[in-house]
Curated annotation (Swiss-Prot):
This is Small ribosomal subunit protein uS7. Keywords: Ribonucleoprotein, Ribosomal protein, RNA-binding, rRNA-binding, tRNA-binding. Part of the 30S ribosomal subunit. Contacts proteins S9 and S11. Gene3D superfamilies: Ribosomal protein S7 domain. PANTHER family: RIBOSOMAL PROTEIN S7. It comes from Synechococcus sp. (strain JA-3-3Ab) (Cyanobacteria bacterium Yellowstone A-Prime). GO terms for cellular component: small ribosomal subunit. CDD domains: uS7_Bacteria. The lineage of its organism: Bacteria, Bacillati, Cyanobacteriota, Cyanophyceae, Synechococcales.
């Protein structure tokens, strides 16, 4: 690890189509091997599918999905005197959003279906409706934190 100062957090520019920073972050999470335009096309197609299926503007649906999938607490391993404890810690807003987007993309990739756009659209709709794998993962993380509440005094 570098001993220099921490790198400053870069500002995420809003995407050109929706003017949303969240959409740009999701494009970056989707991107593989630097193919940003392909990732953008997949996401825009997915958002169009969301518009068709829900009959609503896709941006609020996406924001709702990310809000629902964002964890409030998580566990971090902390070593104390030879034993490793899973210590529950609160999740900062940026990390929570990042985790939610990561889970949406990861579970979209593992879904059965033909195109990535359709799979991502389904995961976004499910997350907006409080169902789906991303929501299940958030619940799992919350359960782990709840189960290890006794070690909260080892907080970082």
């Amino acid at each position: 690890m570098s001993r220099r100062n921490r790198a400053p957090r870069r500002d995420v520019p809003p995407d050109p189509k929706y003017g949303s920073r969240l959409v740009t972050m999701l494009i970056h999470k989707l991107m593989m091997r630097g193919k940003a335009s392909l990732a953008a096309r997949i996401l825009y197609d997915a958002l169009e599918i969301v518009r068709e299926r829900t009959g609503q503007d896709p941006l609020p649906v996406l924001e709702n999905a990310v809000r629902n999938a964002t964890p409030l607490v998580e566990v971090k391993a902390r070593r104390v005197g030879g034993a490793t404890y899973q210590v529950p810690v609160e999740v900062r807003a940026e990390r929570g959003t990042s985790l939610a987007l990561r889970w949406l993309v990861t579970f979209s990739r593992t879904r059965p279906g033909r195109t990535m756009s359709a799979k991502l659209a389904n995961e976004i709709i499910d997350a907006a409706n409080e169902t789906g794998n991303a929501i299940r993962r958030r619940e799992e993380v919350h359960r782990m934190a709840e189960a290890n509440k006794a070690f909260a005094h080892y907080r970082y």
